Regions:
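Strand-loop microenvironment adjacent to phosphate/nucleotide-handling motifs in alpha/beta enzyme folds
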Residues: 1-211
Length: 211
């Protein structure tokens, strides 16, 4: 696997080529496990992107989400560990009771800072850090869940030139998080869950070995 260096990777001046969208950050809560399984199951093993996932979970619960996602699709999933270099083709899951962010030199950072939106881990810290470090290369996705977590982070992603995607509230088990984003932001896309993997694949840098 190859690490993903920070910064924008724009095409040359005047180029019609967009930068690869190789950093995918996802926030979810109630109903999120099934939604996440549906996304990762549809991704190819050659996907040259890193996925970061925040699923709201009680600090006292044991998170089995990496195992669940590794079984659901071809990409290996693991809990994010402080100091781990970001690599392509991997899924990083925020561990219970820790915010997961991306540091300025492309390493994962974990902390137990104040809860945001009444939760830790929260999507907003992850989204903000990804926008700051990777800019227009980021795809931010808000899935089913209660509350408003992810809304402010999605705004930061758009302001940095990244792409904002929201699950269609009518398609979500709990529409609160998607509705919050739609009410307070202007996401680029509002899609049913089944269409989100295709967008990730089209906009991410995919290995030529798969073509």
């Amino acid at each position: 696997m190859f690490s993903i260096e920070p910064g924008n990777r724009e095409g040359p001046p005047g180029s019609l080529t967009e930068p690869p969208r190789d950093i995918v950050v996802i926030g979810a809560s109630r109903g999120g496990v099934e939604a996440l399984k549906g996304i990762v199951a549809a991704l190819p093993p050659s996907l040259q992107s890193a996925l970061f996932i925040v699923l709201h979970i009680s600090p006292t619960h044991v998170s089995l989400l990496p195992d669940v996602l590794s079984r659901a699709g071809p990409l290996p999933a693991e809990h994010g560990r402080d100091g781990t270099r970001v690599e392509r083709g991997r899924i990083y899951v925020a561990p219970p009771d820790h915010h997961m962010t991306v540091g300025p030199i492309g390493f994962i950072r974990l902390d137990q800072g104040p809860k945001e939106n009444h939760t830790r881990p929260a999507a907003d810290p992850l989204f903000r850090s990804a926008a700051s470090v990777y800019g227009s290369r980021v795809i931010g996705i808000i899935l089913t869940g209660g509350g408003s977590d992810g809304t402010q982070g999605l705004i930061a992603i758009e302001q940095a030139g990244g792409l904002a995607i929201v699950q269609d509230p009518g398609d979500a088990r709990d529409p609160s998080m998607p509705m919050s984003a739609l009410l307070h932001d202007n996401p680029d896309l509002c899609l049913p869950l089944s269409e989100i993997p295709g967008v990730i694949i089209r906009l991410s840098s995919v290995s030529q070995a798969s073509t």
